[in-house]
Amino acid sequence: MTTKKKAIMGIKIGMTQIFDENDKAVPVSIIEAGPCTVLQKKKVESDGYESIQVGFYNLKEKLANKPARGHFKKANVKPLRYIKEFRIDNVDDYDVGQEITADIFTTGDLVDVIGTSKGKGFAGGVKRHNFARGSMGHGSKYHRRPGSLGAKGPARVFKGRKLPGRLGGERVTVQGLKVVKVYPDRNLILIKGSIPGPKRGFVIIKNSVKEK
C-alpha cells in the first residue's frame, strides 16, 4: 500500500517528556506545526511536474520585497516568512489559499524531520570527526592534533580529508520518528526523540520514506 505524500512546516519549541499508557516516560520534541497556506499549484501541463508551494509563519509586510509582495497578493494571503515547495500525489486536492494544519498527521505515524543542526563554531578533529586522542603523557606533542595528512609523494592534501573546521549549521534529516500526540487546536505535534536544530528553529515534517 502506497502512503499518500504529505508535509508541513513548523517551529521547534523544545523537548519534554510524557507518560504512555504503561506509565513509561517517553522523551518528545514539541513542534508548532502550521498552519501553512497554499500559495501556488504547479501542474505537469505548465511546469512539467506536480507540486504545491506553501508558506508559513507571518512576516511583516515591510520585510517582504516587491516581487514577494506581488506573489502573496496574487494568492490573496498575508506575507509569510518561509516558502517551500512539496511534491504531492494530486494537486487537485488543494486550493490556493487553503490552510494545511497539524491534523494531517495522526498518532502513530512515522515521519522524517528536516532541520538545520546547531552551529558549534570552529572545532577540532576530536570533536568534529570523533578522532581518537593521542597520548596524554608529558612527552607527547600530539594530544588532540589531527596527525598525518597523507603520504610524502603527492605533496598535497587531498580534497575531502577530515580536518578541523566549522561544525554544525548543516541541513540534517532524521528518519523514522514516531508521532506520539497531535493537538490540532493548538497546532502542536509531539514527536518521539530529538530533532535537529535549536529552540525556535525551522523544521519540515514529512511522512517517512521508510514507512511500511
From Swiss-Prot:
Organism: Syntrophomonas wolfei subsp. wolfei (strain DSM 2245B / Goettingen)
UniProt-listed Pfam families: Ribosomal_L3 (PF00297)
Protein name (database record): Large ribosomal subunit protein uL3
Stretch list, region Disordered: 133-152
Keyword field contains Repeat: no
NCBIfam families registered for this protein in UniProt: L3_bact
Similarity annotation: Belongs to the universal ribosomal protein uL3 family.
Lineage: Bacteria, Bacillati, Bacillota, Clostridia, Eubacteriales
Function description: One of the primary rRNA binding proteins, it binds directly near the 3'-end of the 23S rRNA, where it nucleates assembly of the 50S subunit.
Disulphide bonds in the chain: none
One GO term describing the cellular component: cytosolic large ribosomal subunit
Coiled coil feature spans: none
Gene name of the record: rplC
Keywords: Ribonucleoprotein, Ribosomal protein, RNA-binding, rRNA-binding
